[in-house]
A protein has these predicted regions:
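Residues within membrane-spanning alpha-helices of integral membrane proteins
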Residues: 53, 107-110, 114, 168, ...
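Juxtamembrane boundary at the C-terminal end of a transmembrane helix
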Residues: 2, 235-241
């Protein structure tokens, strides 16, 4: 029996991927896209980036809920301006690419994202850096659905509660722009909404499990696991093509 073209084994794998990705995002503050995009793309490129990003709204809403007083709306404004420009360029570039090349493109962008995450860059938190990194993040997100590494570098060392809340709203803004532009470009429709719904059970389970995982595991070990999963998934995409 198939559901939207996916069999029981694939649906189980999708759920497990979203559980792991959600737990890492809730614990570390970043990493949802780095984990889910390459692994979901291995199952089916039709799950990324649109359906995966649409489902991710649930995770980001959970991050913001109860922590909205930590959000710096001025920083969100600077970020939104950069995201708008970068996302538009990324989506336009994506529409010009042969779909058969997308798995390798996603794999390459994921490896770039991992490289940025471990690069040791030190960027101060100011309007210029937020805007510039948001343009780059928007471009990467428009192409692959992975926005995070550079803006995460800008927020390194900040209060964890502020990071979770502010970046949670930042991702909501980024994802809303991405989905809107994919709709305008004809790359997101009703079938994608159905695919996004397939990801929600794993998100719900992951949100419930996150506090227990955070108590049992060190954040740095989770971060290392996140990067290892992302690299493995990217290599499979590059080899599989």
């Amino acid at each position: 029996m198939l559901l939207l073209g996916f069999g029981p084994a694939e649906l189980l794998a999708i759920t497990l991927i979203m559980v792991v990705a959600t737990v890492i995002q809730m614990a570390v503050g970043v990493g949802l896209s780095l984990v889910m995009i390459p692994l979901l793309a291995i199952i089916s490129p039709s799950l990324v980036p649109g359906p995966a990003i649409a489902a991710a709204f649930v995770v980001m809403a959970a991050m913001v809920r109860g922590n909205s007083h930590h959000i710096d709306r001025g920083e969100i404004g600077w970020g939104a301006a950069g995201l708008l420009v970068g996302t538009a360029i990324g989506v336009l570039a994506l529409t010009a690419i042969d779909p058969t090349h997308l798995p390798r493109l996603f794999g390459a962008l994921i490896l770039l994202a991992v490289g940025l995450s471990i690069s040791g860059l030190n960027l101060s938190l100011n309007a210029r850096n937020i805007t510039v990194t948001s343009v780059i993040s928007g471009f990467m997100g428009g192409m692959s659905g992975i926005h995070g590494p550079l803006i995460g570098v800008v927020y390194a060392g900040q209060n964890p509660a502020k990071v979770r809340a502010t970046l949670g709203l930042y991702w909501i803004v980024a994802y809303a722009m991405l989905i809107a532009m994919h709709v305008a470009a004809g790359r997101f429709g009703f079938a994608d909404i159905g695919r996004a719904a397939l990801l929600v059970p794993g998100i719900v389970i992951g949100t419930w499990l996150a506090p227990y995982a955070m108590a049992a595991m060190d954040r740095e070990r989770m971060r290392i696991a996140m990067l290892a999963i992302a690299v493995a998934g990217a290599l499979v995409l590059l080899i599989k093509g």
